[in-house]
């Protein structure tokens, strides 16, 4: 919404500049999008009166005029405007004037005739051109007065974004009310006098819909619809972005911008019988003021007479009942329409009007009478007429109810986070137009004003208190509270575990806890399956001791259907009945199981498929364990269904939590499977998360030493590495195996293992003697324990 700053300051004029006023409005929640001057700077332009007009002796399109500017001799000015005539008044740029664009006026000659200035059109003083030619000023414009002063061009247009909840601010009055509150000033409202009825003519109004709780109308006869709109009204409307039309339209638009009340004038002669406020009849048609014909539905409210619809209520009038130059008598409307009765209807017809915008957001239901009196006053002053009595039709039970809201000091302090003085709360709400009553217990009972539809709960009142206090005045303070350190999350959630496995390319399988007894026996020949007394089918007759009993049939099913790469996992229960003497002793162990068959990666254009090996599969299991920060060790597995050289038992603190590896080749043959990788992990152990300890990184250089050992090939590498780490002590930072060699130069039954040893001290540089001593000690211990010898280079 655009408004004139000068117009606003006639209502309330705080002692602040334009920029500060703009900032105030923004902080009040009325965001200023733009603050633009009405006209660019210029000087030396005054009101002039054209005394004579003669034809230029040497140019058909030029005239030689004499112009009175109120001082000294009349000026001779050559002018080419088609509308120049004797007796008219227009802006005159005198010698030395500087117009917008730094255009300087000098004495000169046009086709041989001296010109002592320039008669100006609107565009030459940075105003909008309405006609081709000079800007014609009213006959009563005082000659010689500075045009900026006369047209009040030292003004700004304030463009404000009104939020949907602040329909009360769609007017000068609404904005002025906010400025007055924040600056603790009184508004200078114009004196609105009621216009007494001079005739008895009136129109009966019948409301037959719930969408119009209050409707006012007035008959005005013998109106001069051709009366000129005064310059001050034209300028006010222009600076609000509204074009002038005729005196009646301009008056209703002026009241709309001034008070926020939409109004409409009908040609009285075109109304047949009673005025009805009703719902449209199905397929009823209406030609609107914009010449658009619309077909109405019964959820659209209309103003009608006994024969036809005259207007879409609250949106736009109809062409058939509009005021024309031949109109003498009018019926003036001012009404309160319920927001829900208007909302969405304008958009349905592709319309967006000032009236619908205001009615949709809520117009003050007490405003129609004030607006009717204001419009009557202006029409009487500017266009004359005889006024009938104001007709009021009302359904008072449908008017908005002003319910009291209870507000406690503690609620204000708690919601805002700082203490607000009780006196300020009462004063701020009172200045906003609320009726505030202080109860015996100090609690406030607050009745919002009729124009504030957005005040419904106590939080709304607190928001208003903060807004008036100033959001930029909210005190900065750290909250004080009693806190307890949150307990460390020591569980790796199942959902996270599931997501981790899915990310590795596995698909989840959900199966029965029963299995094929034959497969159970194949997987673990040493244990007899626990059979069900009444199985649901012959292939689900045993309680599964391993989830592989369920996953392997899934793999077989998919491989038999041309799936070359199969990867499944299951989170389920397995039954540990090896040590159970009875059903009561039977343990159900939550377990994560993995099965993978096929290539390491899916088939792709950029690389040939590579078969998965033990280390690929072990890496995936390690990634699952790493997600839960489980610290594990790997030792050779002795499980009979696993490949003896490509499997590992997984230990935590020396206790097995599962295994990983390849199925035994003989079992793969029995089950008609290619290379199949499997793993089972105790779910409870995987979900147990371990706290990571902080260790400061050493700033001092590390030293690497390598040793190659000839050692029996039946000694576990893990045992050798653990012995090296134990013997190396605190100075040995880390060690790893980087080479294994058998063949020429290494006797049968032995292999060469090469280890890297990284030495580092946390707080100083190590000396060679310390490292040599540590290396010698490790070599001696390995020789004594495993009969290891250093391999010659």
Residue ranges, per PLM feature:
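Beta-rich nucleic-acid/ligand-interaction surfaces
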Residues: 39-43, 196, 482-488, 511-528, ...
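Conserved mixed alpha/beta core segments that line enzyme active sites in large multi-domain catalysts
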Residues: 47-76, 234-235, 252-320
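Extended, well-folded interaction surfaces typified by the phenylalanyl-tRNA synthetase beta subunit core
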Residues: 174, 405-409, 413-566, 705, ...
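Terminal amphipathic helices with adjacent charged low-complexity linkers/tails
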Residues: 181-207, 383-412, 419
């Amino acid at each position: 919404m655009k408004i004139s700053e000068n117009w606003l300051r006639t209502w309330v004029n705080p002692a602040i500049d334009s920029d500060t006023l703009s900032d105030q409005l923004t902080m009040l929640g009325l965001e200023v999008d733009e603050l633009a001057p009405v006209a660019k700077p210029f000087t030396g332009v005054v009101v002039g009166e054209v005394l004579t007009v003669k034809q230029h002796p040497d140019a058909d399109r030029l005239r030689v005029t004499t112009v009175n500017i109120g001082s000294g001799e009349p000026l001779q000015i050559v002018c080419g405007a088609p509308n120049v005539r004797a007796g008219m008044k227009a802006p005159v740029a005198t010698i030395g004037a500087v117009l917008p664009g730094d255009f300087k006026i000098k004495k000169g000659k046009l086709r041989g005739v001296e010109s002592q200035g320039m008669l100006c059109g609107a565009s030459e003083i940075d105003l909008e051109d309405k006609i081709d030619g000079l800007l014609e000023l009213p006959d009563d414009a005082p000659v010689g007065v500075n045009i900026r002063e006369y047209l009040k061009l030292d003004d700004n247009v304030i463009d404000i974004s009104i939020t949907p909840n602040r329909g009360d601010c769609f007017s000068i009055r609404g904005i002025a009310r906010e400025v007055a509150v924040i600056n603790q000033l009184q508004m200078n409202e114009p004196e609105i006098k009621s216009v007494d009825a001079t005739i008895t003519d009136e129109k009966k109004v019948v409301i037959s819909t719930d969408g119009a709780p209050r409707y006012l109308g007035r008959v005005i006869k013998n109106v001069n619809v051709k009366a000129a709109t005064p310059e001050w009204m034209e300028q006010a409307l222009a600076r609000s972005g509204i074009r002038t039309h005729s005196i009646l339209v301009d008056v209703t638009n002026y009241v709309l911008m001034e008070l926020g009340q939409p109004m409409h004038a009908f040609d009285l002669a075109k109304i047949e019988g009673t005025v009805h406020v009703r719902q449209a009849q199905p397929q009823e048609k209406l030609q609107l003021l914009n010449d658009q014909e619309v077909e109405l539905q019964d959820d659209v409210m209309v103003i009608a007479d006994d024969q036809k619809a005259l207007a879409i209520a609250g949106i736009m009038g109809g062409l058939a009942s509009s005021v024309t130059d031949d109109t003498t008598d009018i019926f003036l409307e001012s009404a309160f329409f319920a927001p829900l009765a208007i909302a969405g209807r304008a958009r349905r017809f592709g319309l967006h009007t000032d009236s619908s915008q205001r009615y949709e957001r809520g117009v003050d239901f007490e405003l129609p009478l004030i607006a009717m009196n204001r419009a009557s006053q202006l029409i009487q002053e500017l266009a004359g007429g005889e006024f009938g009595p104001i007709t009021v039709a009302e359904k008072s039970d449908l008017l908005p109810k002003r319910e009291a809201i209870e507000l406690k000091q503690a609620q204000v302090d708690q919601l805002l986070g700082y203490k607000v003085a009780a006196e300020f709360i009462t004063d701020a709400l009172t200045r906003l137009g609320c009726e505030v009553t202080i109860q015996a217990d100090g609690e406030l009972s607050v009745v919002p004003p009729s124009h504030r539809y957005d005040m419904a709960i106590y939080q709304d009142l607190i928001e208003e208190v903060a807004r008036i206090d100033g959001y930029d005045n909210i005190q900065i303070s750290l909250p004080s509270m009693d806190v307890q350190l949150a307990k460390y999350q020591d569980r790796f959630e199942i959902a996270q575990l599931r997501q981790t496995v899915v990310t590795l390319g596995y698909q989840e399988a959900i199966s029965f806890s029963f299995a094929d007894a034959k497969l159970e026996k194949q997987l673990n020949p040493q244990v007899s399956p626990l059979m069900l007394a009444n199985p649901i089918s012959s292939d689900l007759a045993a309680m599964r001791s391993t989830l592989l009993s369920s996953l392997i049939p899934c793999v077989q099913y998919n491989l038999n259907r041309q799936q070359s790469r199969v990867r499944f996992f299951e989170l389920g229960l397995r039954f540990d009945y090896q040590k159970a003497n009875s059903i009561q002793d039977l343990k159900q162990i939550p377990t994560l199981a993995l099965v993978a068959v096929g290539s390491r990666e899916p088939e792709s254009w950029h690389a040939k498929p590579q078969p998965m090996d033990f280390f690929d599969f072990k890496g995936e299991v390690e990634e699952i364990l790493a997600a839960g920060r489980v610290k594990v060790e790997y030792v050779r597995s002795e499980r009979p269904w696993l490949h003896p050289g490509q499997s590992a038992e997984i230990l935590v603190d020396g206790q097995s939590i599962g295994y990983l590896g390849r199925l035994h080749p003989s079992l793969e043959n029995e089950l008609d499977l290619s290379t199949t990788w499997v793993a089972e992990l105790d779910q409870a152990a995987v979900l147990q998360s371990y706290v990571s300890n902080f260790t400061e990184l050493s700033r001092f250089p590390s030293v690497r030493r390598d040793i190659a050992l000839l050692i029996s090939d039946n000694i576990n590498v893990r045992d050798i590495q653990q012995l090296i780490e134990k013997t190396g002590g605190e100075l040995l930072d880390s060690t790893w195996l980087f080479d294994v060699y058998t063949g020429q130069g290494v006797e049968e039954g032995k292999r060469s293992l090469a280890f890297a040893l990284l030495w580092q001290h946390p707080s100083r540089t190590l000396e060679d003697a310390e490292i040599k001593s540590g290396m010698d000690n490790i070599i001696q211990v390995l020789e004594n324990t495993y009969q290891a010898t250093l391999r010659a280079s």
